[in-house]
Amino acid sequence: MATQFQGSAIIRLNGKEWPSDNDGTLTPGGKERETVKGSRVYGFSEKPTEAMVECTVFNCAETDVMELQNITNATVEFETDIGQVYLLPGAWTVETGTLSADGKIKLKMASIECKRVQ
């Protein structure tokens, strides 16, 4: 039997699926490690990093780029086609929305944490 590998993901904000391109990415966040070295390597230090979802939303009559860029305290879901579901609670938009001439909006959301819920 062949193993199925991920080929796409669905992105939802507050339970609503947004029509998005297949370029979505999930960065779970956590800790970023940096090597500590001087005259030799001593170990590493850690800094916290935010969880992040980035995607391209297709513009339509129901989509408002200004609404998207002003999102705060949202619940973001990243659901893969192999059944994995990740949740970013209390998420906010990181950058202003950019609407291109071909109707695409770049969206970047961050959160304090990322939880795998399925």
From Swiss-Prot:
Region entry Disordered, spans: 12-32
InterPro entries in UniProt: Phage_Mu_GpM_tail_tub
Source organism of the structure: Haemophilus influenzae (strain ATCC 51907 / DSM 11121 / KW20 / Rd)
Highest rank taxon of the organism: Bacteria
One Pfam short name: Tail_tube
Membership in a protein family: To phage Mu protein M.
Name of the molecule in the record: Mu-like prophage FluMu tail tube protein
